[in-house]
Swiss-Prot record:
This is V-type proton ATPase subunit C. Pfam families: V-ATPase_C. It comes from Manduca sexta. V-ATPase is a heteromultimeric enzyme made up of two complexes: the ATP-hydrolytic V1 complex and the proton translocation V0 complex. The V1 complex consists of three catalytic AB heterodimers that form a heterohexamer, three peripheral stalks each consisting of EG heterodimers, one central rotor including subunits D and F, and the regulatory subunits C and H. The proton translocation complex V0 consists of the proton transport subunit a, a ring of proteolipid subunits c9c'', rotary subunit d, subunits e and f, and the accessory subunits VhaAC45 and ATP6AP2. Belongs to the V-ATPase C subunit family.
């Protein structure tokens, strides 16, 4: 299950009573699996600070989730033909995502609760902002390397009209170091092989008789050599084109051929060298982002609960995993359980279907319910596809 509901309701006499009432209400029809979602005693601050922070946390939530999904998506791209291993590489704090979420514990070392809520939000914003910036740099460099390699590899394949010819020809195919003669490479459609063999010597004067040789062919074309005097090369190219024979620009140079092969080898080596460290970086920083995202959710629950239920802080946060096809019934059950929290609830009993936004009551939420509610979708692969 990839969808989780993070809710909170005020403590009755104790938070444990609220927890037991929730379990009792959802247990009857196995509507959901419920887990306590522990949020530490954070610094409350003033009401004005909470209202301002509520809106900012909504934006931070969207930003951190976006970066988390970007990291997951790019990890899938980098894995290429190993993409089926993406799921096992997406972990949080060395745990799978559902287990981390259902056993959530606040990270006191990274986000000290002695800090104000605003400072904790700023710590997360800077942390994830840096990851986002680093991702842009790393992905840009790796994509450039991959793009250069793909371009070179494309030139090694494809049609004879466009592909690199260096690996198809040999030194003996060419007249080299002659003051008067040169060898051209000509692409001839397969259907015109006979025409070429019968007429290439007549395309211009000064063509060496019986100098043509078929050195390679693909499904559509053949690669022929022809030797002629340098002074008629331009004329030959013009008349060859009129007959649908294409002269490829090519100068045989041993050093250039070796350099070309070395470039591909170097790019392949560089890609392999970068692959491992990049995958490790993406895995580590996916974990960082995901954990930060869930801490933002915890902050939002805390702030919204204080704004809704008042002081002293007394609420029970819970993580619900709706059973398959029971979301509607679970929503109805929660509404019945908590409708008393909202004096105007009888005016919008169908809020769960209509996603009504009540100005001044939702504190940045697009859906309003009598209880604090945030949806968490941890399916990174679906949205990363």
């Amino acid at each position: 299950m990839s969808e989780y509901w993070l809710i909170s309701a005020p403590g009755d006499k104790t938070c444990q009573q609220t927890w037991e009432a929730l379990n009792q209400a959802t247990k009857a029809n196995n509507l959901s699996l419920n887990y306590k979602f522990p949020i530490p005693d954070l610094k409350v601050g003033t009401l004005d600070q909470l209202v301002g922070l509520s809106d900012d946390l909504g934006k931070l939530d969207t930003f951190v989730e976006g970066v988390t999904r970007k990291v997951a998506q790019y990890l899938g791209e980098v894995l290429e033909d190993q993409r089926d291993k993406l799921h096992e590489n997406l972990t949080a704090n060395n745990d799978d995502l559902p287990h981390y979420l259902t056993r959530f514990q606040w990270d006191m070392a990274k986000y000290p609760i002695k800090q104000s809520l605003r400072n904790i939000a700023d710590i997360i914003s800077k942390q994830v902002g840096q990851i986002d910036a680093d991702l842009k740099v790393k992905s840009s460099a790796y994509n450039a390397l991959k793009g250069n390699l793909q371009n070179l590899e494309k030139k090694q394949t494809g049609s004879l009209l466009t592909r690199n010819l260096a690996d198809l020809v040999k030194k003996e195919h060419f007249i080299l170091d002659s003051e008067y003669l040169t060898t051209l490479l000509v692409i001839v459609p397969k259907s015109m092989f006979n025409d070429w063999n019968a007429n290439y010597e007549k395309i211009t004067d000064m063509i060496v008789p019986r100098s043509t040789q078929l050195i390679h062919q693909d499904g559509d074309y053949g690669l022929f050599t022809v030797t002629l005097f340098k002074k008629v090369v331009d004329e030959f190219k013009l008349h060859a084109r009129e007959r649908k024979f294409v002269v490829r620009e090519f100068a045989y140079n041993e050093a250039d051929l070796v350099a070309g092969k070395n470039e591909i080898t170097k790019l392949l080596t560089d890609k392999k060298k970068q692959f491992g460290p990049l995958v490790r970086w993406l895995k580590v920083n996916f974990s960082e982002c995901f954990c930060a995202w869930i801490h933002v959710k915890a902050l939002r629950v805390f702030v919204e609960s204080v704004l809704r239920y008042g002081l002293p802080v007394n609420f029970q946060a819970a993580l619900l995993v709706p059973s398959r096809r029971s979301a509607r019934r679970l929503r109805d059950t929660l509404h019945a359980l908590y409708a008393h929290l909202d004096h105007s609830a009888h005016h919008h009993a169908n809020a769960q279907q209509d996603s009504v936004e009540l100005a001044g009551l939702g504190f940045g939420q697009s859906e309003y319910y009598p209880y604090v509610f945030y949806k968490i979708n941890i399916d990174m692969i679906e949205k990363a596809a």
